[in-house]
Amino acid sequence: MIRNPNYTNFVCCAVCNKIIPPAPFGETFKRIHEYKPFKTRFYTHKDILDIGKDILNKEEQFQEDALKERIAQAEADIWAKADERQRQAVKKALEEANDMYKMQIQFLKEEHEKELKEMATRTKMQLHKNLEEELQREHLAAEQRMVHRIQRIMMECHREKVQAVQEAREQERLMAQEEIQSQRRKAMEELMSSGVTVVKDQKKNVNQLIKEKQHEMNLYYCMTQRQKQEEVQEVLQEAEKTHQAKLGSVMDKLVNTQGELLSIAKQLGIMTNWKDFLEEELQETRAAFQKYINYTFPKLSPGHADFILPERKKTPSNLIIPENQTTPD
C-alpha cells in the first residue's frame, strides 16, 4: 500500500491505482470504529483478496474435512454393510455346505444301509447254509455214535449169551457126570449086596440089568439135558428181554440227546445270529464314526484320532475254542 506522510490521501495499490480518501472523523469514525477495527482502513485489494482466499481456503478445507468425514462415515457404513453381507454370505454358504454335507451323509447312509442289508441277507443265507451243514454233520455223527453204541451193545449181548450158554452147558455136563457117577455107585452097591454067588449064577441077568441101568441113565441124562436147555433158553430169553429193555433205554436216551443237540444247535444259531447282528451294528457304528471323523477332521494324519476311535481289542484266549474241541466225537 502507498500512503502519504499525512495519512490524508493515499493510493490503494499499483493494481487499481485508485485514490482512497482519508478516514472519516468524528461520529462517523466512531460508528465505523465500533463496527470494525481501525486498521481495516489500510487493507488493500490484495490483502482483501488474500483474506478472501484464506476464507475460501478455510471454507474449502472445512468442506473437504466434512466431505472426508462423510466419506469416512460412508466408507465405515459400507464396510459394516459389507461385513454384514459377508457374514450373511458365509453363514448362507455354511448352511448350504451343511445341507449338502447332510445330504451326502444321508445318501452315504442309505447306500451303506443298502449294502449292509444285502450283506446281512447274504450272511444270513450263508449262516443258514452253514447251520444246516453243521446240523447234518451233527445228525450224521449222532447216528454213527448211535450205530456204534448199538453194535457195541449187540456184541456185549452176544458175548453174554455165548458165555451163558457155555456156563449152562458146563454146568449141565458136570451135573450129568455127577449123576452118572452116583448111578454107577448105586449099581455097584446093589451088585455087591446081592452076593458073589448070585452074581455068578445070574451073570446074564446082571449084564441085562447093567444095560437097563445104562439105558435108564441115558434117558435121565437126555431129560436132564433137555430141562437144562429149557432153563438156559429161559435165561437167554430173560437176558434178551433185559438187553432189549436196556437197548430201548439207550435209544430213548439217544433220542433225548438228539433233541437236546437240536435244541442246543437252535440256541447256537440264535446266539450266532445275535452275535452277527451285534458285530454288524458295531462295524456300522465304527464305520459311520470313522466317516464322521474323516469329514470333520480331514487334515488329521493317521494315528492322531486313535484316542477317539481306538482299535478293537483281540479276543481273549480263554474265549477261543480250539479246533479239536469243535469237531464231533
Swiss-Prot record:
Keyword annotations from UniProtKB, A to Z: Coiled coil
Species the sequence originates in: Bos taurus (Bovine)
Name of the protein this chain belongs to: Uncharacterized protein C6orf163 homolog
Top-level taxon of the source organism: Eukaryota
Segments forming a coiled coil: 56-247
Coiled coil in keyword set: yes
